Amino acid sequence: RSLVGSEMCIRDRDDVQAYAAQDIKNAIAFVEEHTGQHWDWSHYFECAKRVNDTTRNRLAWLEMNSTPFPQFVGAPFSLYNDTNYMGNCGRSEKFPPIDRKIMRYAERGSRARRMMAKEYRHRAIVWGVQPQYCIDMLNWMVHCWGIVPLTDMLSLVNTRMIADTDTPENREQAFYDMAWLNENMIMRNRTHGGYKVLVDELWEFCETMHADMVIMWEHMSCKALTGMHGQFEEQARARGIHLVWVCHDLCDPRVYTRQAIRDQLNAYMRTVMREEPLDPSIEVLPDENAW
């Protein structure tokens, strides 16, 4: 099965794409009219080449993570993708050399079969709205419980190559490509688009990445996934996938302290999985400075 997920049905309709592309044209025309600046096609296609380079790297890292020895896991995968895909999106020339350096390290680790912990017990897909940047929970999961976070919902963005050569045909295609990238922006590509992209594709990624566990973040201030709670539970059970709900309120420790977030996983692993931590010394961590 390919790592490229099935695309959203409504976004494949020609009339939808034409409407979205026209919106991009209108936005560019508005900026040109009110600023006196003109769209630079040469610069656009330079950026498009870097966007494609980023997409190829992301697919290669996902392919690597589908093996028994994943190398690009946890928050580094998601935080780097967020920055590169959404914040940079091909504009900076500094990213491709960094990408190549990262790839060399990852390939070297894969050949050497390097592991982040002494034992990998479970392979997990991380789904939902995540707080891992502020508490580094994914790194903790690996070292405390041997749960390897292979990828996360916010990193599973565009997998298409866009037109990156300046031709009259590609200039027209570029409006559609920009529309597609906006349609498949981080968060929007999962929480907007219906049941298929939020629920069905999760199980496809579990199969592709050989995951036996899903860490389901439940952000208390965001109800995007709440309506699907029962569906997630029922379908995970039918597939034999362990689904762990972990509540949080992002960086706010007044609602859920960092240890309270970790304890939800601790309780699941001890009571449901009947497992002991790989490293009991980090099961409970001091969080006095969480504020």
Show where each model-derived region lies.
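Long, hydrophobic, well-ordered secondary-structure blocks that form the structural core
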Residues: 15-21
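TRNA-recognition modules of translation machinery and tRNA-sensing kinases, especially anticodon-binding
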Residues: 15, 190-193
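A charged, amphipathic alpha-helical module
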Residues: 21-160, 191
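Hydrophobic alpha/beta core scaffold segments
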Residues: 139-148, 166-173, 177, 181, ...
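Single conserved hydrophobic/aromatic residue that forms the stacking wall/gate
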Residues: 1-10
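Domain-level signal for soluble alpha/beta catalytic cores
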Residues: 114-116, 155-163, 277-291
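Short, charged, surface-exposed secondary-structure boundary motifs
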Residues: 14-15, 158-165, 254-257
